[in-house]
UniProtKB/Swiss-Prot annotation:
General function of this protein: Despite the protein kinase domain is proposed to act predominantly as an ATPase.
Domain of life: Archaea
Active-site residues annotated for this sequence: 214, 231
PANTHER family xref list: SERINE/THREONINE-PROTEIN KINASE RIO1
Binding site for Mg(2+): 219, 231
Protein name: RIO-type serine/threonine-protein kinase Rio1
Source species taxonomy: Archaea, Methanobacteriati, Methanobacteriota, Methanomada group, Methanococci
Catalytic activity: L-seryl-[protein] + ATP = O-phospho-L-seryl-[protein] + ADP + H(+); L-threonyl-[protein] + ATP = O-phospho-L-threonyl-[protein] + ADP + H(+); ATP + H2O = ADP + phosphate + H(+)
Pfam families tied to this protein: RIO1
Length: 290
């Protein structure tokens, strides 16, 4: 099974920079003029120093991908870490005056077995082999497509580009400050928010033919007094064999949260509102297998 070789950042950052940029310079599209090369070098150095400070380690291929986004002028600079989890790290970056979120999947710690389960049931993808590289690239491509589709229908960040295990999307926040999660909000009009969220779930299902798959108060941000759905990595199309079990779980999560806010909510009613159908007991039983 092919796999990326995880290489820690060198103690001498200059050596690391030299090696990575030497590899980049071998590619024709990254033949940069001297001044821009110098500018990029300083940004790369700061990025590596920030990674070292945060005890973040990426394999060489991932660093090459991140640096190529600077060299190719897809991004202006990386600013800092927004969120760090077991399977992915989200960075804040800029593209000119616009902020971007850069999601980097950790090659060494991703749950490839779970990823395969979600990808293989999606008719948009046909994995003939199951190498780690193919799986993670398909996973990023799937999230990219899901975001593109969702952002046309509901409040969700627009995906800008994807490259290997890296996904670039719009940053949800205020002047570079991340928007708060729904779980951290106080004194909102909870009835209003529940109504907007259930309408968004319905539109996503009917118009986008998508099920979020991991929807909860943790994956909904609040910006301009509106909910914004994020993290579409587990989202599936409605034809996927796990679509309805995942939708039931989403309905349970949302109703559990809003009931704590004293909003009258029943997950079976929410599911019927979204799909127009009663819950199939077989689908509900499958939740335990997710």
């Amino acid at each position: 099974m092919s796999c990326y070789k995880v290489m820690p950042i060198a103690k001498n950052i200059d050596d690391e920079l030299y090696e990575l940029n030497k590899l980049l310079s071998e590619k024709e599209e990254f033949q940069l003029d001297r001044e821009y090369q110098k500018e990029i070098l300083e940004k790369e150095r700061k990025f590596l120093e920030d990674l070292k400070t945060a005890n973040e380690v990426f394999d060489k291929r991932t660093l090459m991908t991140l640096f190529s986004l600077l060299a190719g002028k897809h991004l202006t600079e990386y600013i800092g870490i927004v969120n760090s989890g077991k399977e992915a790290v989200v960075f804040k970056a800029r593209k000119g005056k616009f902020y971007r979120a850069v999601k980097v999947y950790r090659v060494a710690t991703c749950d490839f077995k779970t990823m395969s389960k979600y990808i293989q049931g999606d008719p948009r993808f046909h994995l003939r082999k199951s190498s780690r590289r193919q799986i993670i690239h398909a996973w990023v491509e799937k999230e990219f497509r899901n975001l593109r589709r969702a952002s046309e229908i509901i409040n969700a960040p627009k995906a800008r580009l994807r490259r290997e295990n890296v996904l670039v999307m719009d940053f949800v926040g205020y002047r570079g400050i991340p928007a708060p999660k729904l779980k951290d909000m106080q004194d909102l009009d909870w009835e209003k928010y529940f109504k907007i969220i259930k309408e968004s779930m319905k539109k996503l299902y009917e118009e986008g033919e998508l099920v979020h798959g991991d929807l909860s108060e943790y994956n909904i941000l609040v910006k301009d007094d509106e909910p914004v759905f994020i993290d579409f990595s587990q989202s599936v199309i409605t034809q996927h064999p796990l679509a309805h079990p995942l939708l039931i779980r989403d309905c349970i999560n949302i109703c559990n949260f809003f009931r704590r806010k004293r909003v009258d909510c029943n997950y079976k009613d929410l599911y019927k509102y979204i799909t127009g159908k009663e819950i199939d007991p077989i689908d509900e039983a499958m939740i335990k297998q997710l």
